[in-house]
Amino acid sequence: FMSQEIYSKLYLALLRSLQKKSTKVAVMQQNQNFWAMQGLEHHGIIGGSDSFTIIGVSGIGKSSAISRAITLITERKLIEVEETQSKIIPCVMVQCPFDSSVKGLLLNVLHKVDEEIGSNYYENAIRVRATVDMLIGNVSQVALNHIGLLIVDEIQNVCNSKQGKSLVGMLTQLINNSGISICMVGTPESAVFFESAMQLARRSLGLQYQAMEYNHDFQHICKVLYSYQYTKKHTEITDTMIEWLYEHSAGIVSVVVALIHDAQEIAILNGKEELNLESLNEAYQKRFSLLHGYLEPTIKKGKQTTNRRKATTTSTTISEVIENTVVK
């Protein structure tokens, strides 16, 4: 469902952006952007497009879903417009600088465009030592002519930076001066930042995803992953093992993949050649110590679940117990 929702969001955002590029207002905005590049007074008149966020826990597959969606949406890397002899890049993906540098992000956008269409916008900007205001005009013009959808990954970098609000403000100005859609991708940490002010929250409405719940989908993923065994002794996955994987991964798929992979690696190296709870626990203790602080709450819930199940006389399925624990 996440992949379908992300695909739909990106597709519609790209469509809205492309529809504006051949309008009269777009030509008027090009003139305004030219004045901005000269350091003169200018106005954003095209506007009308949108910015949105895709926020989710690290490791749940956001970037993979976005990459697949972009591949499906853009069968060709470039859209060539015969009437204007111009080239449009459907999706440009950049990373938010670690220090939330406005100038760094703008130059990164120009560099990405140069790589795709063979232009020299980046070199020109460096040569003339363009100021931030001039760069905003330059990137707005480039985006209006050559970019359909701009995706800014690792947006959570704005949270702990003094320039965070300035960078988001720059993206807002870029929307108003170019008419393109901008998607910001990050972790739940960035949601707290955007919720701190109304103008930020309004610009960041979008999709939010959490780690998986203990349900049929999680069980199915575990069974599929467990089938890829490279040890000499083949074992079958049990409900207890699936429960253990959930408790020690917090429902994050990438952690489950890493646990099963490292457990097999350890089992092969120590000669036991068997994927079981012993090898999984050894992998967790030796290879995932840095994650223990994040996964401990889930493990404690799992222990409470086990104790409660032993104390009760009624028969309760594992999925129901875990589901009740997660709800509480």
Language-model-detected regions and their locations in the chain:
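Walker A/P-loop nucleotide-binding motif
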Residues: H42-S67
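The feature captures the helix immediately C-terminal to the Walker
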Residues: S67-T71, V257
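Post-Walker A helix-loop "phosphate-sensing" segment adjacent to the P-loop in P-loop NTPases
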Residues: L72-E83, E115-G118
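C-terminal alpha-helical "lid" subdomain
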Residues: N215-H216, K223-K328
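Conserved catalytic segments around the Walker B and adjacent sensor/switch elements
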Residues: L78-P97
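A short, basic N-terminal segment
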Residues: F1-S49, N281, Q285-K328
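The catalytic "switch" region of P-loop NTPases
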Residues: V139, C159, G169-E236, T240
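Mid-core helix/loop region of P-loop NTP-binding domains shared across ATPases and GTPases
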Residues: V27-M37, H43-G47, S101-N108, E116-G164, ...
